[in-house]
């Protein structure tokens, strides 16, 4: 996955494998943290956007689909949602969605790069919203791999892996060893959720993520939707559980609690998204 970022007459373009995706606007900030290159860009169409290592990560007016689709299939379906672990998620969007549920008592958000949090709070405050001041959110500026490795068994009801593409500091978040550790610290009846790349632009990576999850968990399935600032626009999330698939059947009480506060996700949307599998991907998934 080799990315390049270029500017041209008021545009910022991400280049990858012969494809260019650009937004018109202006550059606000560009710096390097100890872990990655961070860019903040103000686009005319989607508002302020965050890029990591020259990849579009999130933008104010296009982030709802990504965050709602990563969080709610897991939290609406898990047996309990008292204790949540988020790996990554430094923009605050995943925490914001989790905190819509009154049942949630504690969220450990483990982000390796403090600058991602600081710059998101300063330049993209609407994404995290009130999550940053919620007493249920515990920020841990640490390595997520190490955090999971040293956490005791059955610690979390839901685990959310909200990492970037499998390059740089996020690469190991897709490894067999890390996901096995996630299974170990997930409580019975719990659900794991992860972003799982574009099935069109990164088909091999997407299939491999689902394959690893199915090797480790009894049940694992991808779900598909649209995220306009990502390569090809077609994106995926994968969900895993040790119980017959917990992530497909939302609890009615939770649906009622959060549905009016969602822009994309709904119970009907979730059911459709799990069944709307591109034919070429379905054939590949049948092989694993």
Curated annotation (Swiss-Prot):
UniProt-annotated binding residues for spermidine = 67, 91
Question: GO CC terms on record?
Answer: cytoplasm
Alphabetical UniProt keywords: Cytoplasm, Polyamine biosynthesis, Spermidine biosynthesis, Transferase
Per its record, the protein catalyses: S-adenosyl 3-(methylsulfanyl)propylamine + putrescine = S-methyl-5'-thioadenosine + spermidine + H(+)
Instruction: Identify the PANTHER family for this entry.
Output: SPERMIDINE SYNTHASE, SPERMIDINE/SPERMINE SYNTHASE
Summary of subunit composition and partner proteins: Homodimer or homotetramer.
Q: Report the protein name in the record.
A: Polyamine aminopropyltransferase
